[in-house]
């Protein structure tokens, strides 16, 4: 039976090798070689000149992740306290926008935020605006939050459904205020969901290029835009693009490692 179970893992192993390990080695190879295939570190030196773009990408990704967490935490708690049949209905509403094409959702925000769009029309009723909200960092963050907040809600909801409500009630019976219950009970016990949600939001946010191009215009280039330009744009250069991808991968892994270590420390404190 154990041998049979191991055989079931073979297709997954082959899939991981072909579509994860092999592409990773290809990226590393191109990042550390020039057009002739000779070893060089010039590509990494070139990437160092785009430090401001990396910093902007990290900043906007962190902001969008924090905003998603602030929105998703109360939503996840609210969903976890509903009856099971209502939970299913509300989860369907949360997931419904994810069924729509990513580009269409972003295009919709272009229309909403345009000078003649509904948002400026509502502001005009109050004698405000019109404001040029497109091609700004705020529009990029808004697009990230809208597209990725479901990925924060779902893991938080899953973690919170596992919290024994009697523990929360016991804390309140012992005189803990709502704020103290939140920070001493709910948040520590939701750390697994918070950690997963941060990873699921931060990784696509820091590497996005569609949202930054459509809502940020050319004035808010992110690292994803530069990588896309190196592989598909006029600046075609596989070696530099691979070096950028490699550096971004290292940054993401470091951030995930930090989140994972924080997760473990918090869980030890709870236990």
Residue ranges of predicted features:
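Transmembrane alpha-helices
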Residues: 11-20, 66, 96, 146, ...
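Transmembrane alpha-helix signature in integral membrane proteins
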Residues: 49-81, 178
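Cytoplasmic-entry segments and transmembrane alpha-helices of multi-pass inner-membrane transporters
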Residues: 8-9, 75-112, 168-169, 182, ...
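Short membrane-interfacial helix/loop motifs at transmembrane-helix boundaries
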Residues: 6, 14-51, 112-116, 218, ...
């Amino acid at each position: 039976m154990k041998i049979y179970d191991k055989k079931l893992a073979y297709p997954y192993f082959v899939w991981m090798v072909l579509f994860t390990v092999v592409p990773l080695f290809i990226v590393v190879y191109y990042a550390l070689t020039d057009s002739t295939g000779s070893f060089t570190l010039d590509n990494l030196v070139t990437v160092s000149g785009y430090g401001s773009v990396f910093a902007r990408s990290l900043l906007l990704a962190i902001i969008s992740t924090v905003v998603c967490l602030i929105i998703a935490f109360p939503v996840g708690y609210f969903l976890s306290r509903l009856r099971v049949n209502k939970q299913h209905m509300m989860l369907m509403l949360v997931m419904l926008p994810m069924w729509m094409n990513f580009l269409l959702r972003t295009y919709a925000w272009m229309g909403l935020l345009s000078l003649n769009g509904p948002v400026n029309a509502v502001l005009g009723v109050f004698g405000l605006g019109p404001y040029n909200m497109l091609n700004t960092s705020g529009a990029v963050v808004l697009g990230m939050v809208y597209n990725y907040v479901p990925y924060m809600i779902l893991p938080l909801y899953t973690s919170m459904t596992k919290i024994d409500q009697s523990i929360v009630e016991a804390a309140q019976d012992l005189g803990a205020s709502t704020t103290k219950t939140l920070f001493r009970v709910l948040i520590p016990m939701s750390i697994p969901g918070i950690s997963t949600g941060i990873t699921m939001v931060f990784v696509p946010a820091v590497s996005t290029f569609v949202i930054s191009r459509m809502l940020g215009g050319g004035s808010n280039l992110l690292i994803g835009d530069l990588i896309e330009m190196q592989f598909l744009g006029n600046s075609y250069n596989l070696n530099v693009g691979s070096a950028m991808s490699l550096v971004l991968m290292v940054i993401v892994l470091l951030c995930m490692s930090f989140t994972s270590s924080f997760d473990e420390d918090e869980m030890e404190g709870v236990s």
